């Protein structure tokens, strides 16, 4: 009875233990990785502790692409619907509008940590150590040891006086090919060898091609100054140089002695110079200034000078008498301006007369001012002696003193101002009067 009860319980236990191995429990992959170090396949350090300590974290900045939503678009989608009932029927086609977002490619900067070799180590597993002070000292010790061994080997191979140049007989044949490598030294069991004596020097070889030009050497020091040589013979006379610039004007010399008295000359019949003076406006009724000539009698010595240039043209002559009346002309056209003008308004002729009268007043004032200015200029010219070359004797000759002693100022009658009238032109009042007479 107990056996019957225990048998089903034992079967359940055995079946449960057998089926338990078939279940799979998912574990996260991060739980299986070693925390603190990356995987081996992704360039991470190995499992050994010596390789792990050569890996370090490095901050890396990367630019990665990503999709960013950029608006939306409307799409028309076709939808097919099958028959919902049994039997022959046509498929139904419908359309619907969808609004879906659009994306564009953008770039952003990502900062991440990567496992890389620590400073001073290289290689795929960061096992190779870069050159540093420790390795340099180790290499120096190894080099010193090798140099000491080379010195010991050179001291051990002292040449002994051989009886002949042949090598000693060997009990065992060498393991290398003597003909192929005559000067090779075996690594194991080298055996004693004797150095052969040095042979005679061979003939000199042919001269090789010239080598490339070397770089220029540094500039040498400046040599000592040589002794001064003898003076050479004088050279040939050179060509004359160009003419120099004119020098500055010298100071005027002292006045010379007075010359001898000349023979008395003939008195001239005509006056030698005329000086003009202005009268007061009270002498005339209209207030115009009047020129009064002052005749100066001079007594000069010497021959007369050359003939002067011709003078300016004279003033225009007086207005001639009016001619005989002409034949009556044909009847002229009617002036539209006169016909169309209403009564009481001034005609064009009257307006022109008024404008010319106003203009004549300004011109008359200007003529008066120019007349006075011309009189003053003429007086100054006669005082200086511009129009009379004999009236300005050379200074220092003694004639200027005689001229000043013999000058006599005389006032005469009025002289017509024909020259001034020629310079100033016709009077605008007279001109307007002449024009009115011509029109009549």
Curated annotation (Swiss-Prot):
Disulfide bonds join 56-118, 83-89, 117-126. InterPro entries: Collagen (IPR008160), Collagen/C1q_domain (IPR050392), EMI_domain (IPR011489). Residues 269-281 have a biased composition (Polar residues). GO terms for cellular component: collagen trimer; endoplasmic reticulum; extracellular matrix; extracellular region; Golgi apparatus. Residues 199-267, 302-334 form the Collagen-like domain. Residues 1-20 form the signal peptide. It is found in: Secreted, Extracellular space, Extracellular matrix. Residues 52-128 form the EMI domain. This is Collagen alpha-1(XXVI) chain.
């Amino acid at each position: 009875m107990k056996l019957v009860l225990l048998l089903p319980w034992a079967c359940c236990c055995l079946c449960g233990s057998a089926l338990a191995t078939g279940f799979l429990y998912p574990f996260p992959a991060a739980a299986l990785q070693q925390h603190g170090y990356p995987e081996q396949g992704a360039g991470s350090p190995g499992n050994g502790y010596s390789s792990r300590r050569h890996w370090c974290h490095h901050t890396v900045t990367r630019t990665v692409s990503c999709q960013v939503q950029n608006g939306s678009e409307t799409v028309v989608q076709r939808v097919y619907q099958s028959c919902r009932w049994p039997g022959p029927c046509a498929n139904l086609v419908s359309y619907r509008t969808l609004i879906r977002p659009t994306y564009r490619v953008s770039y952003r900067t990502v900062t991440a940590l990567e496992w890389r070799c620590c400073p001073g180590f290289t290689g795929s597993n960061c096992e190779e150590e870069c050159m540093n002070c420790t390795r340099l000292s180790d290499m120096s010790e190894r080099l010193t040891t090798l140099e000491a061994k080379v010195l010991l080997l050179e001291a051990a191979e002292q040449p002994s006086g051989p009886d002949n140049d042949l090598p000693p007989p060997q009990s065992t044949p060498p393991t290398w090919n003597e003909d192929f490598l005559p000067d090779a030294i075996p690594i194991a069991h080298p055996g004693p060898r004797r150095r052969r004596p040095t042979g005679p020097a061979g003939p000199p070889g042919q001269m090789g091609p010239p080598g490339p030009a070397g770089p220029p050497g540094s500039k040498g020091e400046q040599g000592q100054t040589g002794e001064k040589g003898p003076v050479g013979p004088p050279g040939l006379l050179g060509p004359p140089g160009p003419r120099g610039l004119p020098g500055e004007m010298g100071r005027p010399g002292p006045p010379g002695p007075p010359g001898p008295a000349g023979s008395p000359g003939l008195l001239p019949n005509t006056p030698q110079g005329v000086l003009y003076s202005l009268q007061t406006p009270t002498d005339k009724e209209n207030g115009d200034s009047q020129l009064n000539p002052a005749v100066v009698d001079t007594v000069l010595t010497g021959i007369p000078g050359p003939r002067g240039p011709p003078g300016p043209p004279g003033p225009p002559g007086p207005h001639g008498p009016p001619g005989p009346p002409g034949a009556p002309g044909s009847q002229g056209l009617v002036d539209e301006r006169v016909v169309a003008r209403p009564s009481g308004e001034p005609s064009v002729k009257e307006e022109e007369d008024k404008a010319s009268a106003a203009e004549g007043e300004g011109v008359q004032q200007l003529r008066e001012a120019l007349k006075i200015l011309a009189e003053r200029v003429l007086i100054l010219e006669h005082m200086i002696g511009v129009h009379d070359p004999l009236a300005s004797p050379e200074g220092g000759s003694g004639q200027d003193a005689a001229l000043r002693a013999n000058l006599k100022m005389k006032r005469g009658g009025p002289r017509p101002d024909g020259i001034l009238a020629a310079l100033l032109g016709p009077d605008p009042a007279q001109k307007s009067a002449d024009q009115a007479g011509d029109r009549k």
